[in-house]
Swiss-Prot record:
Reactions the enzyme catalyzes: androsta-1,4-diene-3,17-dione + 2 reduced [2Fe-2S]-[ferredoxin] + O2 + 2 H(+) = 9alpha-hydroxyandrosta-1,4-diene-3,17-dione + 2 oxidized [2Fe-2S]-[ferredoxin] + H2O
Organism of derivation: Mycolicibacterium smegmatis (strain ATCC 700084 / mc(2)155) (Mycobacterium smegmatis)
GO biological process, one term: steroid biosynthetic process
Keyword hit for Iron: yes
UniProt cross-references to PROSITE patterns, sorted A to Z: RIESKE
Keyword set includes Iron: yes
Name of the protein in its database record: 3-ketosteroid-9-alpha-monooxygenase, oxygenase component
Oligomeric and partner information: Homotrimer. The two-component system 3-ketosteroid-9-alpha-monooxygenase is composed of an oxygenase component KshA and a reductase component KshB.
Function: Involved in the degradation of cholesterol. Catalyzes the introduction of a 9a-hydroxyl moiety into 1,4-androstadiene-3,17-dione (ADD) to yield the 9alpha-hydroxy-1,4-androstadiene-3,17-dione (9OHADD) intermediate which spontaneously form 3-hydroxy-9,10-seconandrost-1,3,5(10)-triene-9,17-dione (HSA) via the meta-cleavage of ring B with concomitant aromatization of ring A.
Free-text remark on how the cofactor is bound: Binds 1 [2Fe-2S] cluster per subunit. Binds 1 Fe cation.
Assigned EC number: 1.14.15.30
Residues holding [2Fe-2S] cluster: C65, H67, C84, H87
Names of the cofactor(s): [2Fe-2S] cluster; Fe cation
Length: 383
């Protein structure tokens, strides 16, 4: 019997981008690169070298020496230059060759690519633009004053390589209300997106599921208010306000990534926690460690999905799925020439998802799960 194919919706996987996103990309905490050694970073389909000069200023260059292709990240830092391990050619942070030790003269015009850098909140950023334009002041990553205040912990930082996925997979999460229930085991009772200019924001109120314990971002009877904003294509600041009964905890989560290739990226996340009054530093550190562990479990829940899903350019949506297509239009501004950015990519857009029906259905599921758990526990006790 022939299979009925009329009305079947096919998945359009589309094509991967032909360039990397324009914008600031976070490489990690400054302290990770400030040990006097050159560090390699695989990013944007190439390799970069990061090194600190004698004043502690961080510099980023193309990693491969323009002389004979040696890997500068395998070399050494000598004064204000990074020295190639192959023939000791010295390169300054401005990209100019400063010295060829064995030569009568150093080529005056010898240059490699030097990358724009910035430091915000103790984190190092590198600028990428397919057209080669310098960064504009209005898209600079905002400062994170809490990190400087002395009243918050230092960054608890994690990173991992995600292979087989494009960066857009993580961006889609900004509009995905329902995955908080199914992947992160919470009940999102309020969910709103606002996109404007180079910023995309998510506002969330989430309560824990009583039928789930110790699963990452599930917090039992805890309540969470969250404001999360992407500043450009790859760096999110997430202000988290957690309530556990009478106890309140303030924290900031950084959710960021940078592309390695078009189908792989490095996912990074970091947490700082406001030091609760009356707690000593050791206890505060334990609190920060515990919170970071929970956040890490949450990211790994997402990673498990990304590892096995397909890219889909034509997702089939229901009302509660929110502004997926609008989010992708916003994201597209970073993958076209500046002259080709259209108003629908940057004009202000707001959407609040009505979670009422979803929460009603989910609460029924939660109660059924609790009933089944109670019956299973009773049966186990009587056996």
């Amino acid at each position: 019997m022939a299979t009925e194919t009329v009305g079947i919706r096919e998945i359009d996987t589309g094509a991967l981008p032909d360039r990397y996103a324009r914008g600031w990309h976070c490489l990690g905490p400054v302290k990770n690169f400030s040990d006097g050694k050159p560090h390699s970073v695989n990013i944007f389909g190439t390799k970069l070298v990061v090194f600190a000069d004698s004043k502690g200023e961080l510099n980023v260059l193309d990693a491969y020496c323009r002389h004979m292709g040696g890997d500068l990240s395998k070399g050494t830092v000598k004064g204000d230059e990074v020295a190639c391990p192959f023939h000791d050619w010295r390169w300054g942070g401005d990209g100019k060759c400063k010295l060829v030790p064995y030569a009568k003269r150093t080529p005056r015009l010898a240059r490699t690519r030097s990358w724009h850098t910035d430091v915000r909140g103790g984190l190092l950023f590198v600028w990428h633009d397919h057209e080669g334009n310098p960064p504009q002041p209005e898209v600079r990553i905002p400062e994170i004053p809490e990190w400087h205040s002395g009243e918050w912990t230092d960054w608890k930082w994690n990173s991992m390589l995600i292979e087989g996925s494009n960066c857009r997979e993580i961006i889609d999460n900004v509009t995905d209300m329902a995955h908080f229930f199914y992947i992160h085991f919470g009940l999102p009772t309020y969910f709103k997106n606002v996109f404007e200019g180079h910023i995309a924001s998510q506002y969330l109120h989430n309560v824990g599921r009583p039928d789930v314990n110790d699963l990452g971002t599930a917090y039992g009877e805890a309540k969470l208010d969250s404001e999360a904003s992407y500043f450009g294509p790859s760096f999110m600041i997430n202000w988290l306000h957690n309530t556990y009964g009478e106890f309140k905890a303030e924290s900031i989560l950084i959710n960021c990534h940078y592309p390695v290739t078009q189908d792989s990226f490095v996912l990074q996340w970091g947490v700082i926690v406001e030091k609760p009054k009356g707690l000593d530093d050791a206890t505060t550190e334990k609190l920060a460690d515990a919170f970071t562990e929970g956040v890490s479990k949450g990211f790994l829940q997402d990673v498990e999905i990304w590892k096995h899903k397909t890219r889909i350019d034509n997702p089939l949506l229901v009302e509660e799925d929110g502004a997926v297509y609008q989010m992708r239009r916003w994201y597209q501004q970073f993958y076209v020439d500046v002259a080709d950015i259209t108003p629908d990519m940057t004009d202000r857009f707001e959407m609040e998802v009505d979670t009422t029906a979803a929460v009603e259905k989910w609460n029924i599921e939660v109660q059924e799960n609790l009933k089944a758990q109670a019956e299973a526990e009773k049966a186990e006790q009587s056996s």
